[in-house]
Amino acid sequence: MCLAYQSGSKTNTKPYTNSRPSFRKGVVEQVWENAKGPDGLVRDPNTGEVINWTPGESRKGVWDMGHIPEAKYSKRHEAYMNGKLTTKEFVDWYNDPANYRPELPSNNRSHKYE
């Protein structure tokens, strides 16, 4: 998808200007597995609340792919839009499970814990 992006006085038509890449196969499941505690449960890192989900089911409304504090999407997207990352580098970064943690949607989308 290529959309125009107004940045100062120039227009960019880069992929992912106004949308995010899709996750590659296995990324979501790996993030989930990486987040399991010693008891096998996944908890929201902000509140400690247990997140109940079964891989293969929709995670819509159950949990979000929250970025870890060191991997803030807006900063990487800005670097990509400014030409500091190629499209491949941006998409590869986006699909690195190490950049994510499961978060409850309300906590992730509110940016309350950033």
Question: What spans do the regions from the language model cover?
Answer:
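Alpha-helical architecture
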Residues: 22, 64-65, 106
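Histidine-centered nuclease catalytic patch
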Residues: 51-98
